[in-house]
Design a protein with these regions (language model features):
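Sec-exported extracytoplasmic/periplasmic mature domains
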Residues: 30, 66-74, 91-95, 132, ...
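Extracytoplasmic small-molecule ligand-binding "clamshell" domains
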Residues: 24-99, 284-286, 298-301, 324, ...
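Bacterial N-terminal signal peptides that target proteins for export
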Residues: 1-8
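Bilobed "Venus flytrap"/periplasmic-binding protein-like clamshell domains
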Residues: 35-44, 54-69, 123-175, 179
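Extended ligand-binding regions for polar small-molecule ligands
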Residues: 60-63, 67-69, 131-135, 139, ...
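Acidic, polar ligand-binding/catalytic clefts
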Residues: 63, 67, 71, 75-140, ...
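Sec/Tat signal peptide C-region and signal peptidase I cleavage site
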Residues: 18-22
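C-terminal functional modules
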Residues: 276-337
Length: 337
């Protein structure tokens, strides 16, 4: 009943927002900034430093949208949102786009009046435990108290996992990841569960990170990506192709350092990507230099990954399935033609 009521309210909010704000691109151009909904502080994805400067993989998508639409990656207002707040904020028009480690699911795509514009990080759910418990697998978690954030796919995946394996557990629920992690660190539960990338990030915030470990089990698929409102296909296209531009740039060997030189490339794909040939920007409602600015000011996907979450960052994440398709991964930009 609670879930049905939630979806009913969500649909109503979405319809109101769509009617009131039919052209997000025009609103953004008029105001001069992109209002981007992000996490309330997840290292590597969206986190502000002590000077208020935001960085992260999700932040880079926001910055890339601003570069494409407004000419500058700096023209972004970052709005931190909890798991519970994020969809309502987008539906109501409080933010223009949600780039907040959000999983693409059937219900979210169909019942909330929202559209997912793509995937900027492929992830999966796992578990973090204290090393001194001596656990090696999630199959040993029977009877465990598990800290989990409500209103997330994580909470539902957790229930599915224990039901499928006929094991008992005690969920300890919280409305924000920050409070859930704090409770786990204080010993109020045996386990904390989330996406593997989030576990790696939250582990760094614990009092003694080295006494905790992430179990190897992956119990779900978590395709994370940017989300926009239903009913504004031009904005959906622009956000989607912003992500594709970063992926295509990596595929074509174009990066922030060589993008000016690559304007001399003979490759038709590179020339279309950089606005030298064709008229791609017109169909998105922007000028033909949109993708050039993304690459010049933000970088290609590989640059963003390495800078924010890669092996040389505290998270030390490997590309894995987040490699390009030609390298054995899942990322596959649609053709620029």
């Amino acid at each position: 009943m609670k879930i049905n009521k939630f979806f009913g309210l969500a649909i109503s909010a979405a319809l109101i927002a769509t009617t009131a704000n039919a052209t997000t691109l025009e609103d953004v151009q008029h105001l001069g900034f992109v209002n981007c909904g992000v996490s309330d502080g997840l290292f590597g994805f969206s986190k502000a430093d002590t000077n208020g400067k935001w960085t992260g993989l999700d932040v880079d998508v926001c910055r890339a949208i601003a570069a494409a639409v407004l000419g500058s990656a700096e023209k972004v207002k970052f709005t931190p949102l909890t798991d519970k707040e994020r969809f309502t904020a987008l539906q109501s028009g409080e933010v223009d786009v949600l780039v907040r480690n959000t999983t693409w699911t059937l219900l979210r795509d169909t019942a909330l009046g929202l559209n997912f514009a793509g995937v900027n990080y492929y992830d999966g759910q796992s578990f973090m435990v204290r090393k001194d418990l001596g656990l090696k697998s999630a199959n040993e978690l029977s009877g465990a108290a598990v800290c989990v954030t409500t209103a997330t796919t994580t909470e539902r995946n957790l229930a599915d996992f224990f039901r499928a394996n006929a094991k008992e557990y005690r969920p300890v629920t919280f409305e924000s990841s920050i409070t859930a992690v704090a409770a786990y660190d204080a010993g109020k539960c045996d386990v904390y569960t989330s996406d593997r990338s989030a576990l790696a990030a939250w582990r760094l915030t614990l009092k003694e990170p080295d006494v905790h470990m992430i179990l190897p089990d992956v119990i779900s698929k978590e395709p994370l990506g940017p989300v926009v409102r239903h009913g504004d296909d031009q904005w959906l296209d622009l956000v989607r192709w912003t992500l594709y531009a970063m992926l295509e740039a990596e595929e074509q060997g174009v990066n922030s350092k060589n993008v000016d030189q690559m304007k001399e490339s003979k490759s038709p794909v590179v020339r279309r990507l950089l606005g030298i040939e064709g008229n791609m920007g017109k169909h998105l409602g922007v000028d033909n230099g949109w993708a050039y600015r993304i690459i010049k000011q933000v970088g290609n996907y590989a640059e963003s990954f390495e800078r924010n979450v890669g092996p040389n960052t505290p998270l030390r994440l490997q590309r894995g399935v987040n490699k390009l398709w030609k390298d054995g991964g899942l990322h596959y930009p649609m053709p620029f033609r």
